[in-house]
Amino acid sequence: MSNEKNENDVEFESVGVVELPEARVIGLYGDVNEENSQEAIVSLLHLHYNRGSEVTDDGTVISLPIEFYVSTGGGMVAEMFAMYDLMRMVRKDCAIQTFGIGKVMSAGVLLLAAGTKGERRIGKNCRIMLHRVLTGDSGSLHSFQATYNEAEIVEEMMFRALADE
């Protein structure tokens, strides 16, 4: 992971989660794992509780949206659901515009779908891939059966969540 600066002297990491608070932008790049999900959750909460607003021509005050860019090969299910649940809560108060870039695979698909309806986009060359839940369990038959049962539950949760979006 390397830190870089752009011409506006904004520091960002080349892998992981990037937050540009003034622009209300979050980027999730790389695996959906504990570190990246924690950073994304903190960024979402920060932008949610420090939400900007603007006044329209008719005097209506509206919350500024959060832009959430996703490029991931997937990752951990628990962390995906943590981000997904938070995104659903946040979007009740302000729109979340999701943008799929590069590749959006596995756990990233649900995060892309968690954006506000009508505010989800993918790049022209973005690849989307969804697959059944994978397990890497080995050991006793009892252990394998428990893992298989859990995988079925998680898979059903994910497909139900996607259908709800």
Describe the role of every protein-language-model region.
Residues M1-E165:
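Terminal-region recognition feature
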